[in-house]
């Protein structure tokens, strides 16, 4: 017993929670002898387009007997008066039934499937008897809120008699209006009696803003007593029959409203029926339901009262009955014209689920994926910003063939991905003013319109991608390189540079894709991707983006503007460098370069070297004094001094010649290496190991330069760089090597040292002589 009850509950709840994707009119009414057309909707799939469609009548036992199907079956009772037509291009099928009788009243199902237990929708059909009217009764049929004009004829004898219109209420006939200017209070400001032109046998009564209670039998009368002329008029006031709208979840719907010229100057609205009331979701006076914020637009079509309401990003709760109308208050009022719709939201949507909210931070970027119908890959794509004015508007910011709107240059681009069923919109350099709602649109299938809310918060840290400085200047004809730093989390992603223009951001080739003017290289060990312009041209000026992506999925980006200027006359030509790379690598390179310059200055200004030079000069002066005294004393002393001087100058001249040759060779080698240098190679050639091991390798023969302090500073810098490297990279071995500049310094230091030694010998020689 418990098991059976559990199975029953499961069946009941599963039936409640599962909504059939078939949709049609719930209630259909007509009168005997007339015809009806019943339209049923089904999901747009290949299987549904080709499967069996049927129309069956439910019996008391729950069995549904087929009356007509798309397989060609037609029951006897429908023979000659019914048809079923499938419209696969619209995903609908229509059942037409003619010559209705009261016996056709009942419950029916329209559905899909090989049996009548497949997918279906319940329809109730009611056929009424033809109403009986008195002889010569004219029938007027009007919708609620409209105006009816009742025509009343009379004979010439009653041309000057009293005219009136009354409404039958049981056996009595209550006057609505007469020619004495009497008007029933319930018809005040709505009923008018008049005659047209020179007509002497017809008068007219207009009743405007019709309401359901106005329906009934009316009597026109001209004259009094037995000679009076009377006409009967039956007025039927109908509720507007709702138009069916079948839409997929996450798609869009448009309500086209045409209320007529009589309300062209009144405020318009769209409301959703809720039991006895109709709640306004938008009107032309600025009222808007918060549940539709960012996804609704009201657009006037012309001056005749036509307007449309577009809703995107449909949700399950959007299904229901809607009405559009007009009134000076912008709210529904009885007796004013309305149009009605019934919206069905199919949860088995072909539109993929996408993010409805995207978050970003100031200075950062967002990449928004917009789906579109894959069958329309050649359609034009757009992206617009929803603005909350009175009716709502969405001006286009960018499109596949549209220029980027002013104010978004350099920071907005649309990347079309044909065949993928989606395109990507990237917006960078975010500000809090960018927060709001955005729409993805195409000029194809109007159902594929999606809404995204962008939320931009204040940044609390630096962006993941960073290029500094934000304003860079390149010189025409020179080589320009700029670096983009990225964190370790982007290590496995593809890094790229692209040049922004009004028609997108075109990705630049990397070095291994061939030599071109603009190229990109990536240094994984230092997490830098660099862009090089070689040589710089005037057309290279503009915005450049550095970004990351995985396949066709775009990630973060950052932007920089590169200005291009002519080389000033007399300015030096610096080939391998650029201001941006120098600024970015300043903490590392400036410390290295300043240390090298400090080492060179200390070597040149060493006081010991100046002391040695002074000793050579003093030794020469002392030798002259000794030679002068020798000349005064004896000729033998003069001859001995000349021999000593000759033996000293010859080796000194040879040493000077050897030193000059060594310096020249070192300078030539240094010049060749400089020609191959760039900023990055300079950082590689002069490694930390060179400064640590230079003393052991003879690079610091001048001990007065006190290199210990310099080595301490450089070692500390090297340790900082090691800790900031990505842990995924193996540590590079540091090999000590001697640069060409150090070799030149070594040769020059050796020359000075040997010169000081010879000078000391010259100083000692004459004394011993």
From Swiss-Prot:
Keywords: Cell membrane, Disulfide bond, Glycoprotein, Immunoglobulin domain, Membrane, Phosphoprotein, Repeat, Secreted, Signal, Transmembrane, Transmembrane helix
Record-annotated disulphide pairs: 40-110, 152-220, 257-324, 370-440, 484-546
Cytoplasmic topology ranges: 667-769
Membrane-spanning ranges: 644-666
GO molecular function annotations of the record: epidermal growth factor receptor binding; polymeric immunoglobulin binding; polymeric immunoglobulin receptor activity; transmembrane signaling receptor activity
Domain of life: Eukaryota
InterPro entries: CD300_family_receptors, Ig-like_dom, Ig-like_dom_sf, Ig-like_fold, Ig_sub, Ig_V-set
Residues carrying covalently attached carbohydrate according to the record: 90, 135, 206, 471
Chain segments carrying region Disordered: 569-604, 619-640, 719-741
Signal peptide: 1-18
GO terms, biological process: detection of chemical stimulus involved in sensory perception of bitter taste; epidermal growth factor receptor signaling pathway; Fc receptor signaling pathway; immunoglobulin transcytosis in epithelial cells mediated by polymeric immunoglobulin receptor; receptor clustering; signal transduction
Compositionally biased region (Basic and acidic residues): 595-604, 731-741
Subunit structure: Interacts (mainly via CDR1-like domain) with dimeric IgA. Interacts (mainly via CDR2-like domain) with pentameric IgM.
Annotated protein name in UniProt: Polymeric immunoglobulin receptor
Species whose genome carries this gene: Rattus norvegicus
UniProt gene name: Pigr
């Amino acid at each position: 017993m418990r098991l059976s009850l559990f199975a029953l509950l499961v069946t009941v709840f599963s039936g409640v929670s599962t909504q059939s994707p078939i949709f049609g009119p719930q209630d259909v009414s007509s009168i005997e002898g007339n015809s009806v057309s019943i339209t049923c909707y089904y999901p747009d799939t290949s299987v549904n387009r080709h499967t069996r469609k049927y129309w069956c009548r439910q019996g008391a036992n729950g069995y549904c007997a087929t009356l007509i199907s798309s397989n060609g079956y037609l029951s006897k009772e429908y023979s000659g008066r019914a048809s079923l037509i499938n419209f696969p291009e619209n995903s609908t099928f229509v059942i037409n039934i003619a010559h209705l009788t009261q016996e056709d009243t009942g419950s029916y199902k329209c559905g899909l499937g090989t049996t009548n237990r497949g997918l279906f929708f319940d329809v109730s059909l009611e056929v009424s008897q033809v109403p009986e009217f008195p002889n010569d009764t004219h029938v007027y049929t009007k919708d609620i809120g409209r105006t009816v004009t009742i025509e009343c004829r009379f004979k010439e004898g009653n041309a000057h008699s009293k005219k009136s219109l009354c409404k039958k209420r049981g056996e009595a006939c209550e006057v609505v209006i007469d020619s004495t200017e009497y008007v029933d209070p319930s018809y005040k400001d709505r009923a008018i009696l008049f005659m047209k032109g020179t007509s002497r046998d017809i008068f007219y009564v207009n009743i405007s803003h019709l309401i359901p209670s106005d329906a009934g039998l009316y009597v026109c009368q001209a004259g009094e007593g037995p000679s009076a002329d009377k006409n009967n008029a039956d007025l039927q006031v109908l509720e507007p029959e709702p138009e069916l709208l079948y839409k997929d979840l996450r798609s869009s719907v448009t309500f086209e409203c045409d209320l007529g010229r009589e309300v062209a100057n009144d405020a318009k609205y769209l409301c959703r029926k809720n039991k006895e009331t109709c709640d306004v979701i938008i009107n032309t006076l600025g009222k808007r339901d918060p549940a539709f914020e960012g996804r609704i637009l009201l657009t006037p079509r012309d001056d005749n009262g036509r307007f449309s309401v577009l809703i995107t990003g449909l949700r399950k709760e959007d299904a229901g009955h809607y009405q559009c109308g007009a009134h000076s208050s912008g709210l529904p009022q009885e007796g004013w014209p309305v149009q009605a719709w019934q919206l069905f939201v199919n949860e088995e949507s072909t539109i993929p689920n996408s993010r409805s909210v995207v978050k970003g931070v100031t200075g950062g970027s967002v990449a928004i994926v917009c789906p579109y119908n894959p069958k329309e890959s050649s359609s034009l794509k757009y992206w617009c910003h929803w603005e909350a004015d009175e009716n709502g508007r969405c001006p286009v910011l960018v499109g596949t063939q549209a220029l980027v709107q002013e104010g978004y240059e350099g920071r907005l681009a649309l990347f079309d991905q044909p065949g993928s069923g989606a395109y990507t919109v990237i917006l960078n350099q975010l500000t809090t003013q960018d927060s709001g709602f955005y729409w993805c649109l195409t000029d194809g299938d109007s159902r594929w319109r999606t809404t995204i809310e962008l939320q931009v918060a204040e940044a609390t840290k630096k962006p993941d991608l960073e290029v500094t400085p934000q304003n860079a200047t390149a010189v025409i004809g020179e080589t320009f390189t700029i670096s983009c730093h990225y964190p370790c989390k982007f290590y496995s992603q593809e890094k790229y540079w692209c040049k922004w223009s009004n028609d997108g951001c075109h990705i630049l080739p990397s070095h291994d894709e061939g030599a071109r003017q603009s190229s990109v290289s990536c240094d994984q060990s230092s997490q830098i991707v660099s862009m090089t312009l070689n040589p710089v041209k005037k057309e290279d000026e503009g915005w450049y983006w550095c970004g990351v992506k995985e396949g066709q999925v775009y990630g973060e980006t950052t932007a920089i503007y590169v200005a291009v200027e002519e080389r000033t006359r007399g300015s030096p030509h610096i080939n391998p460098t650029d201001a941006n790379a120098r600024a970015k690598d300043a903490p590392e390179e400036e410390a290295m370069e300043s240390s090298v310059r400090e080492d060179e200055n200390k070597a040149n200004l060493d006081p010991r070297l100046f002391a040695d030079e002074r000793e050579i000069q003093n030794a020469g002066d002392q030798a002259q004094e000794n030679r002068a005294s020798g000349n005064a004393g004896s000729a033998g002393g003069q001859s001995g001094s000349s021999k000593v001087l000759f033996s000293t100058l010859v080796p000194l001249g040879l040493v000077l010649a050897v030193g000059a040759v060594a310096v020249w060779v070192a300078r030539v080698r240094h010049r060749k290496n400089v020609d191959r240098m760039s900023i990055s190679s300079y950082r590689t050639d002069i490694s930390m190991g060179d400064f640590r091991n230079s003393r052991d390798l003879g690079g610091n023969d001048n001990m007065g330069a006190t290199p210990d302090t310099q080595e301490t500073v450089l070692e500390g810098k090297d340790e900082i760089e090691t800790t900031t490297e990505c842990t995924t990279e193996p540590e590079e071995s540091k090999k000590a090597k001697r640069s060409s500049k150090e070799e030149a310094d070594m040769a020059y230091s050796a020359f000075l040292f040997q010169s000081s030694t010879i000078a000391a010998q010259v100083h000692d020689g004459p004394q011993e002589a």
